[in-house]
Amino acid sequence: LQRVQVRMAKWDGSPHWTYETVVLGEDEHGLWLGSGVGTLFERPGASYRQARPRLHLVTDDWCLPSFQAPGTPYAVYVDVCTPPDLEGGELHAFDLDLDVVRGPSGRTWVDDEDEFAAHRVEQGYPPLVVEAATAACARVLGAVRAGEPPYDGTTTTAPWMERLAQLVGSSDSAARAADSSGR
């Protein structure tokens, strides 16, 4: 079982979310990672244990998409970030605040535009980073709304969710116990 520790940071270098994943495999969309029920997500001042399985897709784009199992507030959650750097069992990227989100009803929106506006000034995002982040956000928003793969519901993600269950198992009772975190 190959594990990858995800270590996100803010542009100023301060730590953001960290969590452990397992490598599921690769396809035309990129490298698929998974985190099972009970995975600990931590950042300064906050932590929770994941209530449902989640997939993470590593590409060379300015984003880190995640795909949630049913029963969560988000079906798709895409962090706009610098292109992820995966080396030696660790993935590093700078979170650039913007998130493209699709809820279980299909409603899709951009979250944290206010944070992006504030942090681009406070943390001094270079113009090329601002341009790349806003372009990635627009591109991903269009793809999620259009249902383009890999944002096509379970068509692309179902085999990877099955692979995750094979590798780390899945437990409805563990999911119910973790539900108290609300994630």
Residue ranges and their predicted role:
Residues L1-R49:
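Charge-rich, low-complexity N-terminal segments
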Residues M8, G25, S35, F67-Q68, ...:
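Hydrophobic side chains in beta-strands
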Residues G30-L31, C63, V76, T108:
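Hydrophobic residues embedded in beta-strands of well-ordered beta-sheets
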Residues G36-V37, E42-D85, D97:
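Aromatic- and glycine-enriched beta-alpha-beta binding-site module
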Residues G71-Q123:
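Conserved, surface-exposed functional patches that form binding/active-site neighborhoods
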Residues D79-C81, D85, E90-H92, E131-A136, ...:
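A long amphipathic alpha-helix within ATP-dependent nucleotide-binding catalytic cores
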Residues E115-R139:
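Short, surface-exposed, low-complexity cationic segments
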Residues A135-R183:
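Cysteine/selenocysteine-centered motifs that mediate thiol-based redox chemistry or coordinate metal-sulfur cofactors
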